[in-house]
Structures are given as C-alpha cells and as structure tokens.
Amino acid sequence: MQGRLSVWLIKHGLVHRSLGFDYQGIETLQIKPEDWHSIAVILYVYGYNYLRSQCAYDVAPGGLLASVYHLTRIEYGIDQPEEVCIKVFAPRRNPRIPSVFWIWKSADFQERESYDMLGISYNNHPRLKRILMPESWIGWPLRKDYIAPNFYEIQDAH
C-alpha cells in the first residue's frame, strides 16, 4: 500500500521505493543516495520544512548502512502534522550520502554523529568531523563488525 507522499512522488516522476508504514502509521520511503539531495529539496519546497531527527544504523554485519530522516509538514494546522520517514542506504565500503545541512540546518550535529559512530560521509557538509569520539579514534563504534579495543584511556579533564 502506498501513502499520499509516495503517490505524489510517482505522479511527479520521482524515483523511490515505498517501505510501507511504521507502527504509528508514518509512511516510510527509500531513496537512492544519488537521488536524495534533489528529492530533499523538493520535499522542503512541498512543505516538509522541519527535520525532526536524523539518525543512522548498521543494517547487518557486512551489509548496508542506513541514514534515516524524519520529516514533518504542517499544512492543515499544528494538531495535524504530516510526517514521513526517509531511509537512504549506502554501501559499507564507501558510505557516501549527500548532506541535507543546506536544506535543514538541524542536520548539522545529527549528520556529524552518524559520521562519528558509523563512518557515513555526508557530501558537502561544512564541518564533517568527529563530534563524540576523539579525533584520533580509529574505527566506527556503532558498526556491527566493529572490534572494540581492549583498553580504555582515561584522560584528565584539565
């Protein structure tokens, strides 16, 4: 079953894949990395001007990485928000996804966290660098195939 946004995207010739609805009835769509930036701009113009959250996860050991965007559109009143979940999958070897920082400024720290924890590079992000881990940290701690070091260095806060 396709939701309203999926039908609208098909009507306008925009390539995507419907992933159905989540437990709250929010439509979930898959967008290819190469199509994501242009579709993100179109969604913003269409009224999805609020990026509620962005996160990322490792789909399976050795598999794809996913960047997830929760967008909100308020057309008929604050009590009737229209929400959509967008998933963009990237290959593990070279995970590159266009940054949406220039569309939704709230993506800044969220994309940086996804980079820091999973190693997803967000093309054209103005400050893509580690945000939680030290710059010298090797690896991506939230990947399912990450091997944690058997030591932990405690640094003085001063």
From Swiss-Prot:
GO terms for molecular function: NADH dehydrogenase (ubiquinone) activity; quinone binding. GO terms for cellular component: chloroplast thylakoid membrane. Keywords: Chloroplast, Membrane, NAD, NADP, Plastid, Plastoquinone, Quinone, Thylakoid, Translocase, Transport. GO terms for biological process: photosynthesis, light reaction. Transmembrane segments: none annotated. It is a peripheral membrane protein. Its EC number is 7.1.1.-. InterPro entries: NADH_DH_suC, NADH_quin_OxRdtase_su_C/D-like, NADH_UbQ_OxRdtase_30kDa_su, NADH_UbQ_OxRdtase_CS. It is found in: Plastid, Chloroplast thylakoid membrane. It catalyses: a plastoquinone + NADH + (n+1) H(+)(in) = a plastoquinol + NAD(+) + n H(+)(out); a plastoquinone + NADPH + (n+1) H(+)(in) = a plastoquinol + NADP(+) + n H(+)(out). Pfam families: Complex1_30kDa (PF00329). The keyword Protease does not apply. NDH shuttles electrons from NAD(P)H:plastoquinone, via FMN and iron-sulfur (Fe-S) centers, to quinones in the photosynthetic chain and possibly in a chloroplast respiratory chain. The immediate electron acceptor for the enzyme in this species is believed to be plastoquinone. Couples the redox reaction to proton translocation, and thus conserves the redox energy in a proton gradient. Belongs to the complex I 30 kDa subunit family. NCBIfam families: PRK12494.1 (NF009141). NDH is composed of at least 16 different subunits, 5 of which are encoded in the nucleus. This is NAD(P)H-quinone oxidoreductase subunit J, chloroplastic.
